[in-house]
């Protein structure tokens, strides 16, 4: 049996930062809800807008600073988080994190590019390159000194069904 020297220490209460995800379909109020909650938690609010300037419609209702992102490479989200930290914001809203997955230079597009570069149809090899990038972005969110709220879009599923009268 191996001797494990992993000492436990007494737990000490410390200030923890909010990590919240608000998930819903387009138009469900994710941006408004995140701004409303952020206003109660912090005085200086930063918002990363990856939804084509959609947060601007709330500029008259809430006080916040915005950064428009058009390239959703994980490193751009990391850079934006660090910028918000350096500018001493209290809270950061990432509206939305979805393009980091399925947007321009998001994870899915990066996998396609890596697979093409590697000349393979085996996406596992491509994911080997992309997963560490994505994990670094998630780690930046989790380790930040800011309260962070992220919004994410759910897919809307449409179903066509026939009624009793055949319509």
Predicted regions mapped to residue ranges:
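Conserved P-loop
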Residues: 2-6, 10-94, 98-103
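P-loop NTPase motor core
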Residues: 91-167
């Amino acid at each position: 049996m191996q001797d494990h020297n992993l000492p436990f220490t007494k737990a000490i209460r410390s200030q923890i930062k909010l990590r919240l995800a608000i998930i819903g379909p387009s138009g469900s109020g994710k941006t408004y809800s995140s701004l409303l909650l952020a206003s109660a938690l912090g005085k200086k609010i930063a918002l990363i807008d990856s939804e084509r300037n959609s947060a601007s419609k709330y500029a008259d209702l809430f006080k916040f600073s915005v950064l428009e992102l058009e390239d959703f490479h994980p490193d751009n989200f990391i850079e934006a988080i660090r910028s918000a930290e350096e500018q001493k914001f209290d809270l950061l809203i990432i509206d939305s994190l979805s393009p980091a997955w399925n947007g321009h230079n998001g994870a899915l597009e990066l996998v396609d590019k890596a697979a093409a570069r590697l000349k393979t149809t085996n996406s596992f090899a491509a994911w080997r390159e992309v997963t560490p990038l994505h994990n670094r972005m998630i780690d930046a969110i989790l380790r930040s000194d800011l309260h962070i709220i992220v919004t994410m879009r759910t897919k809307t599923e449409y179903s066509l069904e026939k009624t009793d009268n055949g319509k």
